[in-house]
Design a protein with these regions (language model features):
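Second-shell residues forming the walls of enzyme active-site clefts
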Residues: 1-97, 105-110
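C-terminal extensions of enzymes
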Residues: 100-125
């Protein structure tokens, strides 16, 4: 479904009214990079997923090898944008921005002493 505009836009967003961010599967997994039985590159997979309606693409554990796959994907998206083969969606950017924290992270030591944290910790068997 991650490459299907029908499922992502018509069903998930349209029929079901989902307004949150849609993430891809981990596109570094080869099994997640097949369309119609054909293996595709991470760059092609990211473009296809974003074109279908995903807002954020996951390429997990790709900081290895100097981040080569990440760099190739960013470069590939930039080339696709310059040649008119892909355009980022403003709505996708807004949904991604909505996931960012609105305030600084709490101090770790203060968090570990907070009643909410201590209560949650006590619930763990």
């Amino acid at each position: 479904a991650g490459y299907s505009a029908r499922w992502l836009q018509a069903v998930l967003r349209g029929r079901l009214g989902f307004g949150g961010a849609i993430f891809t599967d981990d596109l570094s997994m080869e099994a997640a990079r097949h369309i119609e039985g054909r293996a595709i590159s991470p760059v092609e997979a990211v473009r296809a997923a974003l074109d279908a309606g995903c807002d954020l693409a996951l390429l997990c554990n790709q900081s290895l090898d100097g981040g080569k796959v990440l760099d190739e994907t960013i470069d590939g998206l930039a080339r696709a944008q310059l040649t008119g083969r892909w355009q980022p969606r403003a709505a996708s950017g807004a949904r991604g921005q909505a996931l960012l924290p609105r305030e600084p992270a709490p101090d770790w030591d203060a968090l570990m002493r907070s009643p909410a944290y201590l209560h949650a910790l006590a619930l763990i068997p």
